[in-house]
Amino acid sequence: MDIDPYKEFGATVELLSFLPSDFFPSVRDLXDTASALYREALESPEHCSPHHTALRQAILCWGKLMTLATWVGNNLEDPASRDLVVNYVNTNMGLKIRQLLWFHISCLTFGRETVLEYLVSFGVWIRTPPAYRPPNAPILSTLPETTVVRRRDRGRSPRRRTPSPRRRRSQSPRRRRSQSRESQC
């Protein structure tokens, strides 16, 4: 079963894969950040948001994974096998947990739309050949100042506010006909 943990939040594993693995802070730093910013909400028995729930689950999952890794480390006698297991957990599972924690902390801190815009911007930037792209990658904390995302919060897009001239013309003859029919009756 291929489950994408970002799907319900409007992102995908592929979208996050554009960010290099060294982009994400350590699990310890991310867990400390989540705790410092959202401890009350994470420990609350009440539901706060899907991001809080996902953060809570990722932190619990990492704790269980560390318990398992410790058990394996203590019970595997072959040092080569032990190292393989520890490296696999840290490299593969660690990266996935770091991505999850970063995504949900960022969504809670900056807003989901801003984070998605950042992921798209970074994806475009990284895929653009170096000769044709700006020297610096987009920065999440400055993104709200430079993107269109803020305009969406203020109101509708211009396309919705102003109907196209075609619509106006096609609606007005119908109105005239219906009004004239009513006046004839």
UniProtKB/Swiss-Prot annotation:
The protein's name in its UniProt record = Capsid protein
Cellular component terms per the entry's GO annotation: host cell; host cell cytoplasm; T=4 icosahedral viral capsid
Per the UniProt record, which residue ranges are transmembrane?
none
A single Gene Ontology molecular function, please? DNA binding
Identify the stretch(es) annotated as RNA binding.
179-185
Q: Where is this region: 3 X 8 AA repeats of S-P-R-R-R-[PR]-S-Q?
A: 157-179
- Please provide the record's keywords in A-Z order: Capsid protein, Cytoplasmic inwards viral transport, DNA-binding, Host cytoplasm, Host-virus interaction, Microtubular inwards viral transport, Phosphoprotein, Repeat, RNA-binding, T=4 icosahedral capsid protein, Viral penetration into host nucleus, Virion, Virus entry into host cell
Tree of life domain: Viruses
Subcellular location(s): the record lists:
Virion; Host cytoplasm
- Matches recorded under Pfam families: Hepatitis_core (PF00906)
User: What HAMAP family does its record include?
Assistant: HBV_HBEAG
List, as start-end ranges, the regions of compositional bias called Basic residues.
Answer: 149-178
> PTM per UniProt?
Phosphorylated by host SRPK1, SRPK2, and maybe protein kinase C or GAPDH. Phosphorylation is critical for pregenomic RNA packaging. Protein kinase C phosphorylation is stimulated by HBx protein and may play a role in transport of the viral genome to the nucleus at the late step during the viral replication cycle.
Q: What does this protein do?
A: Self assembles to form an icosahedral capsid. Most capsids appear to be large particles with an icosahedral symmetry of T=4 and consist of 240 copies of capsid protein, though a fraction forms smaller T=3 particles consisting of 180 capsid proteins. Entering capsids are transported along microtubules to the nucleus. Phosphorylation of the capsid is thought to induce exposure of nuclear localization signal in the C-terminal portion of the capsid protein that allows binding to the nuclear pore complex via the importin (karyopherin-) alpha and beta.
Q: Which GO terms describe its biological process?
A: microtubule-dependent intracellular transport of viral material towards nucleus; symbiont entry into host cell; viral penetration into host nucleus
The main location class comes to virion
